[in-house]
Amino acid sequence: MPYLDRNGVRLAYSAEGTGPAILLSHGFGLTRRMWQGQVEHLKDRYRVITWDFRGHGESDYPSDPDLYSMEQSIADMTALMDHLDVDKAIVGGLSLGGYTSLSFYAAHPERCAARLIIDCGP
């Protein structure tokens, strides 16, 4: 399992396939593995990137509450894209992942080829 080190916090991720990038973020209490069915169907045409938020799945669980915020999540997504040499991606997610993807778009519209927002509240 590959990890990205973000100032001492390890973030688990996977990147499968080739083609335009899709960055998918999971819902609260879930993990990147929730996307496995979609990854299997998309990886022949896309580079599908999934990741575990801080405090989820195989990523680290920092004890400092200041290390959890929307700004941190946006910075984590940006760092992951940079780490994987992805300039622009279809950015999407479910629930918390959808809300975070919208926030990422608001902060970095130039890095979003499109948005895929699923079951996300206002």
Q: What is the predicted function of each stretch?
A:
Residues 40-43, 49-92:
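Active-site loop/oxyanion-hole signature of alpha/beta-hydrolase fold enzymes
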Residues 19, 27-30, 95:
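Active-site glycine-rich loops that stabilize anionic/oxyanionic intermediates
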